[in-house]
């Protein structure tokens, strides 16, 4: 059994492994609030396009 088949031996349906950024498919630093599901790096790039405004 190869390493790849052991690593992906079952589908991820819950937890951090099940969620990824909808822009770049990155798994760390996800912003899930309001159903965004975007990593923080992509959020900084796309925040103005989405409609978020920095107040300070």
UniProtKB/Swiss-Prot annotation:
Zn(2+) binds at residues 21, 24, 39, 42. PROSITE patterns: RIBOSOMAL_S14. The keyword Kinase does not apply. Pfam families: Ribosomal_S14. It comes from the Eukaryota. One of its GO terms (cellular component) is cytosolic small ribosomal subunit. Binds 1 zinc ion per subunit. InterPro entries: Ribosomal_uS14, Ribosomal_uS14_CS, RIbosomal_uS14_euk_arc, Ribosomal_uS14_sf. This is Small ribosomal subunit protein uS14. It comes from Pyricularia oryzae (strain 70-15 / ATCC MYA-4617 / FGSC 8958). Its cofactor is Zn(2+). The keyword Zinc applies.
């Amino acid at each position: 059994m190869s390493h790849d088949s052991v690593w992906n031996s079952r589908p991820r349906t819950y937890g951090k492994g099940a969620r990824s950024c909808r822009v770049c498919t990155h798994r760390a630093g996800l912003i899930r609030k309001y159903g965004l599901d975007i990593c923080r790096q992509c959020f900084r790039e796309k925040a103005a396009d989405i409609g978020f405004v920095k107040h300070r």
